[in-house]
Amino acid sequence: MLPQHSDIEIAWYASIQQEPNGWKTVTTQFYIQEFSEYIAPLQDAVDLEIATEEERSLLEA
């Protein structure tokens, strides 16, 4: 079993790009795209008023 929020860490590390000059940068667009996969279902549940209190708190965190 993976630790809580490990999928978020995976998305974060995947968004880091190695630049030709050796710098590592986070590509915001990729980061937002990855997180939208996790946020959209929670937002839909809140909008449809079927989210639990735990799900609401995850979205507000």
UniProtKB/Swiss-Prot annotation:
Disruption phenotype: Produces less H(2) during fermentation on minimal glucose medium, but not on complex glucose or complex formate medium. Alters production of organic acids when grown on minimal glucose medium; complementation was not reported. It comes from the Bacteria. InterPro entries: Phage_T4_Gp38_tail_assem (IPR003458). It holds the Pfam family Caudo_TAP. Belongs to the tfa family. Might play a role in cell growth during glycolysis. Encoded by the cryptic lambdoid prophage DLP12. This is Protein TfaX. It comes from Escherichia coli (strain K12).
